Amino acid sequence: MEFAAENEGKSGGGLHSVAEGVRLSPEPGREGVRDLAGAEEFGGGEEGKGLTGVKEIGDGEEGSRQRPEEIPMDLTVVKQEIIDWPGTEGRLAGQWVEQEVEDRPEVKDENAGVLEVKQETDSSLVVKEAKVGDLEVKEEVMDSSEVKEEKDNLEIKQEEKFVGQCIKEELMHGECVKEEKDFLKKEIVDDTKVKEEPPINHPVGCKRKLAMSRCETCGTEEAKYRCPRCMRYSCSLPCVKKHKAELTCNGVRDKTAYISIQQFTEMNLLSDYRFLEDVARTADHISRDAFLKRPISNKHMYFMKNRARRQGINLKLLPNGFTKRKENSTFFDKKKQQFCWHVKLQFPQSQAEYIEKRVPDDKTINEILKPYIDPEKSDPVIRQRLKAYIRSQTGVQILMKIEYMQQNLVRYYELDPYKSLLDNLRNKVIIEYPTLHVVLKGSNNDMKVLRQVKSESTKNLGNEN
């Protein structure tokens, strides 16, 4: 208080002018007090140049327009209280200023645009004056002898200012980043709205098409089905039926098909395991079925064998379950007292095979072959397939395999086409039904006829003698 009164008495209106010229800097990061109007000097200083002992900035500093360095006080307590000037009670431009600094200046930002600086001074007073346009800074010091410049404290303060500015810049960048994130979120939401299109409702019963596959039967449409047995692609039911007819495929997956060890996977192992379980389940079911345990009557088999033996034919029948046994449709007609045979015809030169059922034993071989190789009476479709036999001028030869021969020894009987089937089957062994091989005469084949073998053996004996 006394210090303020003495200053008021010495300076007169100068102190009032200083108070009016002092205002807070509105720029963030600048904590100094600016003096826009020059203050009268204390102790002989000129008006407008500030107090005595003030350092003026040279021309080089003004030209470079660098920010003036602030000189902190080392462990000084500065107090400044301005009281009892006319019309004002510590109020400067509508703002309260109470400056208190202990140990080092502290700056507190309470509101944006409002800065309260508290400084308490006991022996010396430092006032920093700066102009925005001219960058002029004036320092007023009561006792310049007590002011010491310490580089360490100055560097610390500069670092604190730099850190504070960095923090503010980071906050500003943080707000920008948040705004960018919000903008990106909005864009993502818009994209999701665009992507959320109504699902396509496929018609009922529409199956997924096999990618990049064509029907292997017609070759025009895209494949929709794949046969589990032969893995052939098909597009429709007619193509499925056609491929089954052409390849004699039943469409059922072959559980016992061969798979190499390189292609064997866990799915194949699981399939084999389930197959064995099915076999065990079927065997257990059969063992528990009382009806299946009954012995099958063999009266019909014995009757067929006895009738064939009476006619001089050695007929052999296979047990139930064999394929040839299932295919056999031979029966004995009691009214006519003759056999109606199941006959298989094979044409090796055309790779064709046909079956004749209910063939009476009094029918000749030529009559049996007439619907196949006769140029006039044969079926047109069969004639087209057996055109090699129809166009042949050498004629055909009818052979039948000899049963119960030694291993890897295959021989054939040559049948007489002008004799009946019964005459050709006498004194021969027949397993289930006769199979006739129709070959072209003079064709090079590995079929050796029994008559040729006998003639060759007799020739060899004559040459030795």
Curated annotation (Swiss-Prot):
Residues that coordinate or bind Zn(2+) 1: C215, C218, C235, C239
Positions contributing to Zn(2+) 2 binding: C227, C230, H243, C249
PROSITE patterns the record matches: ZF_HIT
A GO term for molecular function: zinc ion binding
Biased composition (Basic and acidic residues): 56-70
In-chain residues carrying the UniProt-annotated modification Phosphoserine: S25
GO biological process, one term: maturation of LSU-rRNA from tricistronic rRNA transcript (SSU-rRNA, 5.8S rRNA, LSU-rRNA)
Gene3D superfamilies in UniProt: 3.30.60.190
Cross-link Glycyl lysine isopeptide (Lys-Gly) (interchain with G-Cter in SUMO2) residue location(s): K79, K108, K118, K138, K148, K157, K168, K178, K195, K454
GO cellular component, one term: pre-snoRNP complex
Region listing for Disordered, in residue ranges: 1-72
InterPro entries: BCD1 (IPR051639), Znf_HIT (IPR007529)
Subunit-structure text: Interacts with FBL, SNU13, NOP58, NUFIP1, RUVBL1, RUVBL2 and TAF9. Interacts (via HIT-type zinc finger) with the RUVBL1/RUVBL2 complex in the presence of ADP.
Family: Belongs to the BCD1 family.
Purpose of the protein: Required for box C/D snoRNAs accumulation involved in snoRNA processing, snoRNA transport to the nucleolus and ribosome biogenesis.
PANTHER family the UniProt entry points to: BOX C_D SNORNA PROTEIN 1 (PTHR13483:SF3), BOX C_D SNORNA PROTEIN 1-RELATED (PTHR13483)
This protein's name: Box C/D snoRNA protein 1
The species this protein was found in: Pongo abelii (Sumatran orangutan)
Higher taxonomy: Eukaryota, Metazoa, Chordata, Craniata, Vertebrata
